[in-house]
Regions:
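Class I SAM-dependent methyltransferase SAM-binding "motif I" and its flanking Rossmann-like core
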Residues: 1-60
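A contiguous loop/helix-start segment that scaffolds small-molecule binding in enzyme catalytic cores
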Residues: 59-152
Length: 152
């Protein structure tokens, strides 16, 4: 968008770790199968588009990492996102809030979709909602790589 006004800026690619993968490393292996990341910030993306993406992720049974879940002025997005996901998932679906991941004093809240408290989330948090096959194994959130037949 800025190229016509400013020309081609120099670009350097630096490999790194996203907040979602850093949070996943802290949690165990929640991203072991299909997953997606969705930003709840409606500053540049209209809220109806974000809601459609949340519904699609829930219908596709993806593990969902929620970026930009809450700020001082954006308070309704996370409760609405949890309601949309909760309409399509069991309330006992594993969920977690990882705040300040990779920084000193990082905090982890292990919970379920039905018990996740939006008041414990801020702009420095990443929220991870498991899929139908995600489980807690002790302190570890695990999403197996394959769908095993029931009873195996």
């Amino acid at each position: 968008e800025l190229t016509p006004a400013f020309g081609e800026p120099p670009v350097t690619v630096v490999p790194g770790v996203t907040a979602a993968t850093a949070a996943a490393a802290v949690l165990g292996a929640p991203l072991g199968h299909d997953h997606c990341s969705i930003s709840l910030s409606d500053l540049l993306t209209p809220w109806p588009v974000i809601e459609a993406r949340l519904r699609a992720a829930a219908d596709g049974d993806f593990v969902v990492s929620l970026y930009n879940p809450r700020s001082r002025t954006r308070r309704h997005q996370l409760p609405r996102a949890l309601a949309l996901l909760g309409a399509r998932r069991d309330p006992d679906t594993p969920a977690a809030v990882v705040t300040d991941v990779g920084r000193p004093g990082a905090q982890v809240i292990r919970t379920t979709l039905g018990r996740l408290d939006p008041d414990q989330v801020d702009m420095l948090s990443l929220v991870v909602i498991g899929s139908s096959i995600t489980r807690w194994s002790g302190p570890h959130m695990v999403t197996p790589r394959g769908y095993l037949p029931e009873g195996t």
